[in-house]
Regions:
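Short coil turns that delineate tetratricopeptide repeat
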Residues: 6, 39-40, 73, 107-109, ...
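Long, contiguous interaction/recruitment modules in multidomain scaffold/adaptor proteins
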Residues: 1-11, 17-23, 27, 34-37
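Structural signature of tandem alpha-helical TPR/SEL1-like repeats
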Residues: 21-31, 54-67, 89-104, 110, ...
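Conserved alpha-helical positions within TPR/SEL1-like repeat arrays
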Residues: 13-21, 43-54, 77-87, 113-120, ...
């Protein structure tokens, strides 16, 4: 691949992200796809999946995350995202292993997300002690992560 194609792929990815943040999801999808055609990256597949999720297309979102993992299995984001999408589908037992893979991944800037999501799985499956551990671990990593604080508060009220 030429350096010119690589640079264009990056520009298309950045434009796709900008469009996604502006709520222009259909256009964002087209730009992500064009970026992937020029230079497939785990990030582009993951963000395309995230865009599908915002459209309620969870199966498509999961499929893109699986493609991301095939491109770069060290990136943690797609593992976490698959877990989160499975949670949205009520498929808690399937979500857990994906979240554990995110936690074990080598490349991830936000490890508090899979810990929080694993806590959600544990809470939904009545594993309250483990849920507490997961929410606390998320807060240890990111002390001001509101969803984990709120989940821990709900859990305390639930088990009193």
């Amino acid at each position: 691949m030429s350096a010119q194609n690589y640079e264009l792929a990056i520009e298309l990815f950045q434009k796709a992200y900008q469009l996604q943040m502006q709520g222009e999801l259909e256009l964002a999808i087209e730009f992500y796809k064009r970026s992937i055609e020029l230079h497939p990256t785990a990030e582009a597949h993951t963000f395309l999946g995230w865009t599908y999720r915002h459209q309620g297309k969870l199966d498509e979102a999961i499929a893109e995350c699986e493609k991301a993992i095939a491109v770069d299995p060290t990136l943690g984001n797609p593992y976490n995202d698959i877990g989160a999408y499975l949670i949205e589908q009520g498929r808690y037992e399937e979500a857990g292993p994906w979240l554990e893979k995110a936690i074990a991944s080598k490349r991830y800037e936000a490890y508090h997300y899979p810990w929080y999501n694993l806590g959600r799985v544990c809470l939904a499956t009545d594993q309250y002690s483990r849920a507490r551990e997961c929410f606390r671990k998320a807060l240890e990593i990111e002390p001001r992560y509101r969803p984990a604080e709120e989940a821990l508060d709900r859990l305390r009220r639930l088990v009193q």
